[in-house]
């Protein structure tokens, strides 16, 4: 579960960007108020692909959860900041701030608007990113393990 604003889950107060992972068979009562996302990873999901072994690793993002099948991390960039060239496995990206990112993949440049609370599937890729917006990039990434 990802809090999109103030919520209370099992007596624990959560703020925008906070997560809580529930293991298979674990039960909970959803928040009675507030905005949040629930992400369910099914046991028979398609096989995960990863970039080739010689690609550079993802930058040091804050790891929020590291499990056997996936890692959840928070990705942050300041306006004007450019990442080093890096790779990701297949992942879900949830954008928390409205801003713009420029990415260079395979020599091609693309600028995209990041829309808050939008959940997107992102393929395995090697790229460089730059925050070209006026506010920081803040994303929650659920990266699948092959």
Tell me what each language-model feature is.
Residues 1-10, 88-107:
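Glycine- and acidic-residue-biased ligand/ion/polar-headgroup-sensing regions
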Residues 9-27, 106-125:
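Short acidic-glycine-tyrosine-enriched beta hairpin
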Residues 24-45, 98, 124-146:
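Ligand-binding loop in jelly-roll beta-barrel domains
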Residues 4, 26-29, 85-90, 127-128:
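Histidine-centered active-site/metal-ligand motif
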Residues 27-72, 76:
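Surface-exposed beta-loop interaction hotspot
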Residues 1-4, 56-83, 90-93, 141-142:
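A short glycine-rich, His/Asp/Glu-containing loop-to-beta-strand
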Residues 11-12, 30-31, 75, 82-87, ...:
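Short histidine-centered beta-strand/loop micro-motifs
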Residues 9-10, 38-39, 72-73, 101-103, ...:
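Short hydrophobic/aromatic-rich beta-strand segments that constitute the beta-sheet cores
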